[in-house]
């Protein structure tokens, strides 16, 4: 036998054995756990009516999955510094078997972007292996822009929302990163940042504040009339940050300045991504304080108003946790309804701009007792967790067209509710929520966002005055009371 014939025989034998092994795996684990391949993933787009996501061949796609990090990697999780390809592959096998089709994962400054203008090989090598595993299992990946989880270089420890040099560095990051992965279908969309928030007060905002007021009013007399207070020449030229008990119009103006900063931050990064990958989808992972239905303080409003952000983004994302009456402990039916009404009111406002909406973080604890807050919260069952998460999806369905649970696994190292929010226990066994998630995944993928106006017509709810909510400390609580009343009546 010649060398060429020997190689051909070996190749055929290898193909036969590979096929036999794959068949055995399919029979033993079920088709859902069988890996896909890169060619099975189609590029995701927003449909022409901006109601939902579709594949490039026109099929509806509903991102239904998890935020990915592993237990045993510390807190905050060291996703890339403790990257284990074997463990990641097992995680993807498990996710595929339970209906996950999309994972959101944090990129970090220390692993990917220690110096402005240069991507780190350390992070890129792990990222490319992560993408390859995702392609192998036919699961989309939703990367979130550089975060603090694995440490911050000195240049990124300053304000990276308003500081011009920091924003320029982020623009360059996206030029490099999005350009490198242009056209890679496995990447569902880019999330610019996890829960960005414009600072309440710093030197850059102080520099911009006089210019904002001068552009808006033109004269101190006009400003005095609007604020209904006397404005001195000094106050006109060097205005102070308004106190929270100050004139409502003054507070609103300052909040609008913060929104202007947020708009510029988003616009510049979106433009950077689109310049190197015009078909890439881009969003921002909004904290729930971006919709001021409930704010611990007017200063905690993020400045990222959904109706303003929507003009720059392909779709909108929001995160939600049940905090309507403090830390939700499953104690009463009234608490449950208050939190469901709160969730609906937040997602409703995010849907208002007419873009698809993904609830990119949600979930709550179950399957034990939390150790946080001196252990004061009562234990919760896995069934309570599963019921809450399923209800959250049900109440936002029709407004949202995607949901990503916070955590694949419980994470005992966490210093917050993440300790018990996973689909799976630390040992990899499925919780009640994993089984419910799997059940929902079989039907949720046909879901599609309704137009906001259509939903409004079918769900009579009180109008939300966004401007008052970010400038009047008493407005939001009254709104929530009225909203809950209407929500309860509809139930």
PLM segments and residue spans:
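Bacterial N-terminal signal peptides that target proteins for export
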Residues: 2-17
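Bacterial N-terminal signal peptides
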Residues: 18-28
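Mature N-terminal, pre-catalytic/accessory segment of carbohydrate-active enzymes
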Residues: 33-67, 470-491
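Active-site mouth of glycoside hydrolases
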Residues: 41-313, 369-372, 380, 396-405, ...
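Active-site clefts of carbohydrate-active enzymes
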Residues: 245-253, 288-289, 319-334, 346-386, ...
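Well-ordered, non-membrane alpha-helical segments in soluble/globular domains
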Residues: 266, 339-344, 383-390
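Aromatic-rich peripheral "rim/lid" segments of glycoside hydrolase catalytic domains that contact
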Residues: 369-491
